[in-house]
Amino acid sequence: CGTLMGGLSKILTECEHDVSGSDLNFYEPMSSQLEALKIDLVKGYERLPDADLYVIGNALSRGNPCVEKILEENLDYISGPEMLGKIIKSKKVIAVSGTHGKTTVSAMTASILQSKYGDVGYLIGGVLGDGSWSARLGSNEYFIVEADEYDSAFFDKRSKFIHYFPNILAINNIEFCLLYTSPSPRDTIRS
């Protein structure tokens, strides 16, 4: 389970949703975090858990048994970034983007705002140095999100950060290096 889907699972449990998930494998640090939340983790894609809405991560594509069942049965689904965007739409969103350092800058921003304003929300793509969760909804108006340029899902090729509508955008740095997301320097700048 990736850091976006794992963090989103944590936030959804805070919103009092029942959450379960399927993946081929569950790795640290996400596996421990999800197990602590008592989320039903299904190893493999043979069994699609019952749900009102399926949140599909960008690691899944057509041909995946769960994806195919969702499409064949016309079940409701959404991408992880779009789901997060809906949850945080009423917050003051601070998005941290750039080629390198997003996790570090996001964590530092969350820590600074936490000390100033209290219970801020965040979703960060890494483990925090103090051992706290990689995500939480927070009770105040601020939400910090690590906003990367990877596509949202097989059915939504837009960058994840398109869904976050930040009030503040921190662009850490831009480097032409990810040819699979931006085939030219112009595409890198445009995204």
Say what each PLM segment does.
Residues 1-83:
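N-terminal leader/targeting and accessory segments in enzymes
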Residues 11-14, 49, 58, 62-183, ...:
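Phosphate-binding loop of NTP-binding sites
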